[in-house]
Amino acid sequence: MSRATPASDSYTNSNLFSSTYLDEHVDSIDAWDCDEEAKRVFEELRALWRAEGDLVRSHNEDELLSAWIDEVCEALGFDSLSETTLPGGYGYNDHLLFDSPERRREAVREKRAGREEGAYGLASALLEAKQWDADFTERFADDRSYRDASHQVKYYLERTPDDLGWGILTGGRTW
């Protein structure tokens, strides 16, 4: 299957990767050839949006997690584990995301054995959810070890094993 080379105006480069890499090399990566899977997932997400779209703004954080965010993560191929204590007992995050049910089950075993660090080390990402359209930079009113939602995810990642390199902050619309 031939692959189209992306045009620089089809994306916003935040300089995580060079434009040359994105324009000339990324399309040669086998994993990048995922158009059919992407279309299938997009249609699944579109159907979910048709079912939930008029409700999401009224959901509190837990409802949004259950009715929207969890469903989006599942459609994207993630399995999840809820409210896992950070290693060292520095709080807990909303979800750990795993690339397979087997890795999630292995993480549950680690968690039950009191090895939170092992559970976090098996995760693909941690996820912190807020209400729909939450301002991630708005200062929290109460005294916490982190000042806002963006800093909260950074704080969590700093207290997890190096194997876990990704944190996702979402209010359902912005990820």
Pin down the residues of each PLM region.
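A short, conserved, highly charged catalytic patch centered on acidic carboxylates
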Residues: 1-166
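Hydrophobic or amphipathic alpha-helical targeting/insertion segments
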Residues: 163-175
